[in-house]
């Protein structure tokens, strides 16, 4: 088993070298073939997904799978349409490989270019969500990265079906290296993959807090991702109530099972009387369970709103991924920011305010990869950010941060073009000086 896994990874690693130099035309042709194949084979995809949903129902009944994961697992006709649209959006994006990032003249006829290039071989490990396969494969293909996929057992039929359809489509177009995309399906394969740091350049895990933490703790391979999505909205005393009601409702209710839905609502005491009762009524009608601190519990109880429960200390650190919301009253914007930076996951947090100085203060102090002003946290998404799709959301402080599109799948190399220059001429008593002059030259124009 271990040797089979390693041979798959080595094959993908070799293919990554060839894939890095495949032309934009060939890559776009392969992407269009992928989109057409998904459309043609959608019936087979939906049938495979039904098998997974039946298995998932058994797992949920046994307490081994949450409703949030079951929701993410489901594939519908509209989701297939979304997969197809996502791939075609990637086709429209400019090929990022080989782009000149900067050009510096060191001396006459000694020019240094900084040029973008693929990372190499990327491992993507994910729970549920079969739509991850076309999303990530399209971005990795366009950015010239070979990819190893490992999905959860609950989505095995869907993942295998979609993966096979896409790989056959890619191979049918010609010009693409064989073996650039591989699929692993067993739990044992995960542990083997995590140990192959000699070949795998980056891991992108997508799943629960515990799942991502497990990956981070059991590999030497760099990991890009976030462990949880504990997102907040702070309703400032200078908020427009109508804006606050619609934004806060959307941020929780529109799709509660995802990582950019809010888990905690922070409300300034000076607007609580005006804002919170109607907001709570909207949430309760939508089936949201409200877990309130003492201040919000007292206010809402006096207004006759129910059912309500009291928040525990643990609630502030929980990612519910469900129709559950914690509510807390705060006295100042600083108290709100301190709460977010203490209990949040640095994913996406927002403020509702009409006050420019409050807005500026919040943006400057909150330590989040995305900050929303008078807009729903649900916008924190690669597709909505114009990236075509995303491989995930990162809360890392280095490399990529926030929704990661193709730019997060690239690094760069330095290329120095000279005419026989040697360092000895630029050292010692009579050393030639460097000019270090920025130039507006592109490496692709070099003869």
From Swiss-Prot:
Keywords: Amino-acid biosynthesis, Cytoplasm, NADP, Oxidoreductase, Proline biosynthesis
Top-level class of the enzyme under EC nomenclature: oxidoreductase
Metabolic or biological pathway, per its Swiss-Prot or TrEMBL entry: Amino-acid biosynthesis; L-proline biosynthesis; L-glutamate 5-semialdehyde from L-glutamate: step 2/2
Molecular-function GO terms, alphabetical: glutamate-5-semialdehyde dehydrogenase activity; NADP binding
GO biological process, one term: L-proline biosynthetic process
PROSITE patterns xref list: PROA
Any single GO CC term annotated in Swiss-Prot or TrEMBL for this entry: cytoplasm
Record keyword Cytoplasm present: yes
Enzyme nomenclature, EC number: 1.2.1.41
One Pfam family cited in the UniProt record for this chain: Aldedh
Cited InterPro entries: Ald_DH/histidinol_DH, Ald_DH_C, Ald_DH_N, Aldehyde_DH_dom, G-glutamylP_reductase_CS, Glu-5-SA_DH, GPR_dom
Localization of this protein: Cytoplasm
Record flagged with keyword Oxidoreductase: yes
Reaction catalyzed: L-glutamate 5-semialdehyde + phosphate + NADP(+) = L-glutamyl 5-phosphate + NADPH + H(+)
Chief location bin: cytoplasm
Similarity comment: family membership: Belongs to the gamma-glutamyl phosphate reductase family.
Function statement: Catalyzes the NADPH-dependent reduction of L-glutamate 5-phosphate into L-glutamate 5-semialdehyde and phosphate. The product spontaneously undergoes cyclization to form 1-pyrroline-5-carboxylate.
Family matches, as HAMAP family: ProA
Name this protein carries in UniProt: Gamma-glutamyl phosphate reductase
Species: Methanosarcina mazei (strain ATCC BAA-159 / DSM 3647 / Goe1 / Go1 / JCM 11833 / OCM 88) (Methanosarcina frisia)
């Amino acid at each position: 088993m271990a040797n089979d896994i390693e041979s798959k990874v080595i094959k993908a690693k070799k293919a990554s070298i060839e894939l890095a130099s495949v032309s934009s035309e060939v890559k776009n042709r392969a992407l269009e073939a992928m989109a057409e194949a998904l459309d043609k084979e959608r019936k087979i995809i939906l049938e495979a997904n039904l098998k997974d949903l039946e298995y998932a129902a058994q797992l949920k009944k046994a307490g081994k799978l949450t409703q949030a994961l079951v929701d993410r697992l489901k594939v519908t006709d509209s989701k297939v349409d979304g997969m197809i649209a996502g791939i075609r959006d990637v086709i429209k994006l400019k090929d990022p490989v080989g782009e000149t990032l900067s050009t510096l003249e060191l001396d006459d006829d000694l020019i240094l270019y900084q040029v973008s290039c693929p990372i190499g071989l990327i491992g993507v490990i994910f729970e549920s969500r079969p739509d991850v396969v076309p999303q990530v494969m399209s971005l990795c293909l366009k950015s010239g990265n070979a990819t190893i996929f490992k999905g959860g057992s609950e989505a095995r039929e869907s993942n295998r079906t979609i993966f096979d359809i896409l790989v056959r489509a890619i191979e049918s177009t010609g010009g693409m290296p064989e073996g650039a995309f591989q699929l692993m399906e067993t739990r044992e394969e995960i542990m083997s993959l995590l140990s192959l740091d000699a070949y795998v350049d980056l891991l992108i895990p997508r799943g629960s807090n515990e799942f991502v933490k497990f990956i981070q703790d059991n590999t030497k391979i760099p990991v890009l991702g976030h462990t949880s999505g504990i997102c907040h909205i702070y309703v400032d005393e200078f908020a427009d109530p109508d804006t606050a009601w619609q934004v806060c409702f959307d941020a929780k209710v529109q799709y509660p099972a995802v990582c950019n839905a809010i888990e905690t609502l922070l409300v300034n005491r000076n607007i609580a009387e005006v804002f919170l009762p109607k907001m709570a009524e909207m949430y309760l009608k939508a089936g949201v369970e409200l877990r309130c601190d003492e201040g919000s519990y007292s206010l809402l109880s006096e207004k006759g709103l129910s059912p309500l429960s009291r928040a525990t200390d643990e609630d502030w650190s929980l990612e519910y991924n469900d129709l559950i919301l914690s509510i807390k009253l705060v006295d100042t914007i600083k108290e709100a920011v301190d709460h977010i930076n203490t209990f949040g996951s640095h994913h996406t947090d927002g403020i509702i305010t009409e006050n420019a100085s409050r807005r500026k203060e919040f943006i400057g102090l909150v330590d989040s990869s995305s900050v929303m002003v008078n807009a729903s946290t649900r916008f924190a998404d690669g597709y909505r950010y114009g990236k075509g799709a995303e491989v995930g959301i990162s809360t890392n402080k280095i490399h990529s941060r926030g929704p990661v599109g193709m730019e997060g799948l690239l690094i760069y190399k330095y290329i120095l073009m000279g005419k026989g220059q040697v360092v000895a001429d630029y050292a010692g008593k009579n050393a030639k000086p460097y000019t270090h002059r920025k130039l507006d030259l592109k490496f692709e124009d070099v003869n």
